[in-house]
Amino acid sequence: MEKKHIYLFCSAGMSTSLLVSKMRAQAEKYEVPVIIEAFPETLAGEKGQNADVVLLGPQIAYMLPEIQRLLPNKPVEVIDSLLYGKVDGLGVLKAAVAAIKKAAAN
């Protein structure tokens, strides 16, 4: 299976770095073929074009409509604040994979 790209965006690109590390560890553990990267929200329009799913940190949830407009053919979702706060790599990975599958079914 081709690797899917999961891109996380937050206000500076730094607050998601620990979450990305945990997601990568879970993806490796469960052999989920994904590439997971984090970027600042200012790069969402540019970098998001290459993503299979775009995840926004809860602190930029207000930007959801704007980023959906920039990336009309991509699934764009806000990371659940409880999962984000707990730095739950597996939970966020599962949500991202579900969003990719949902988009593929449509």
From Swiss-Prot:
It is an enzyme of class 2 (transferase). Its main location: cytoplasm. Its EC number is 2.7.1.196. One of its GO terms (biological process) is N,N'-diacetylchitobiose import. The active site is at C10 (phosphocysteine intermediate). GO terms for molecular function: kinase activity; protein-N(PI)-phosphohistidine-sugar phosphotransferase activity; protein-phosphocysteine-N,N'-diacetylchitobiose phosphotransferase system transporter activity; protein-phosphocysteine-sugar phosphotransferase activity. Keywords: Cytoplasm, Kinase, Phosphoprotein, Phosphotransferase system, Sugar transport, Transferase, Transport. It catalyses: N,N'-diacetylchitobiose(out) + N(pros)-phospho-L-histidyl-[protein] = diacetylchitobiose-6'-phosphate(in) + L-histidyl-[protein]. The keyword rRNA-binding does not apply. It is found in: Cytoplasm. Changing C10S: Unable to be phosphorylated by EIIA. Induction: By GlcNAc2, GlcNAc3 and beta-N,N'-diacetylchitobiose (Me-TCB). Residues 3-106 form the PTS EIIB type-3 domain. One of its GO terms (cellular component) is cytosol. It comes from the Bacteria. The modification Phosphocysteine is found at C10. The phosphoenolpyruvate-dependent sugar phosphotransferase system (sugar PTS), a major carbohydrate active transport system, catalyzes the phosphorylation of incoming sugar substrates concomitantly with their translocation across the cell membrane. The enzyme II ChbABC PTS system is involved in the transport of the chitin disaccharide N,N'-diacetylchitobiose (GlcNAc2). Also able to use N,N',N''-triacetyl chitotriose (GlcNAc3). The PTS EIIB type-3 domain is phosphorylated by phospho-EIIA on a cysteinyl residue. Then, it transfers the phosphoryl group to the sugar substrate concomitantly with the sugar uptake processed by the PTS EIIC type-3 domain. NCBIfam families: PRK10499.1, pts-lac. Forms a complex with ChbA (EIIA). ChbB is a monomer in both its unphosphorylated and phosphorylated forms. This is PTS system N,N'-diacetylchitobiose-specific EIIB component. It comes from Escherichia coli (strain K12). The gene is chbB.
